């Protein structure tokens, strides 16, 4: 039994040797620039102030959702997608300045967006209509998956 155990451990040790070093296609490191309820730590101005230092170590920074949610939120219940980028993390101008500073310091920006998380204006299916680059977007009750909650959403949509 000891021989079998020793052989197994020896095989595992040799497998681990292959995992050392950088992958052949390695091209950078990404930093998650936020955590849950990190409104002050992840403000656009706070992240921008760190851009020179972050640029020394990271190639990408993953930032939280930037759309307006109508209140203090991490952004996963966004109300506006195209027309209002004043979020819990700062204004649209501050966001644009952050992205510009990141680019100047060799950092790419990745935004965290969950498309199917929407906040409504007043009722269950009352989403704002927005126009972006001449195209008007309107989310209706029929745009919500009928089976994502056991049919409850479809029943509500059918009442509309």
Tell what function each PLM region has.
Residues 21-60, 64-160:
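Substrate-binding/active-site clefts of carbohydrate-active enzymes
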